[in-house]
């Protein structure tokens, strides 16, 4: 069910052998907050969940990963959405991640740049701020 929705939405399944969800007698409202890149697939998952569980309302609020994690930690929402790994200080607060999908990301470098390729570690260092100058990439 859920993994099929994830694949249909263009993400990569993380559990080929996941069992189909079986409806229960859940009632009430579930608030999900966080990552704008997870939001669209979470909307589809919420729709499917609500069809199976008629007495549940799922509200998806899109912002960013940090807001989703903090909101879940602080009890503002029931589930936080994140499109990044948890930071040490987040896991120290007891936050646990459950991966639901993988997504592809492309990094485009201007044609005038002499750099011919970037490793995953270099991209990570650029986005975490460890590398702030192109000259440092080639070292």
Regions found by a protein language model. Give the residues of each.
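Flexible loop/hinge segments at secondary-structure junctions
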Residues: 1-139
């Amino acid at each position: 069910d859920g993994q099929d929705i994830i694949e249909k939405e263009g993400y990569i399944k993380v559990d080929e052998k996941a069992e189909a969800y079986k409806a229960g007698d859940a009632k009430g409202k579930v608030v999900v907050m966080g990552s704008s890149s997870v939001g669209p697939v979470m909307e589809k998952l919420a729709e499917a969940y609500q069809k199976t569980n008629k007495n549940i309302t799922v509200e998806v609020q899109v912002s960013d990963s940090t807001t989703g994690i903090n909101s879940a930690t602080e009890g503002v929402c029931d589930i936080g959405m994140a499109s990044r790994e948890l930071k040490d200080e987040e896991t120290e607060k007891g936050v646990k991640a459950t991966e639901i999908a993988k997504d592809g990301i492309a990094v485009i470098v201007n044609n005038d740049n002499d750099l011919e390729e970037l490793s995953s570690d270099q991209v990570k260092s650029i986005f975490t701020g460890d590398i702030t100058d192109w000259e440092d990439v080639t070292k």
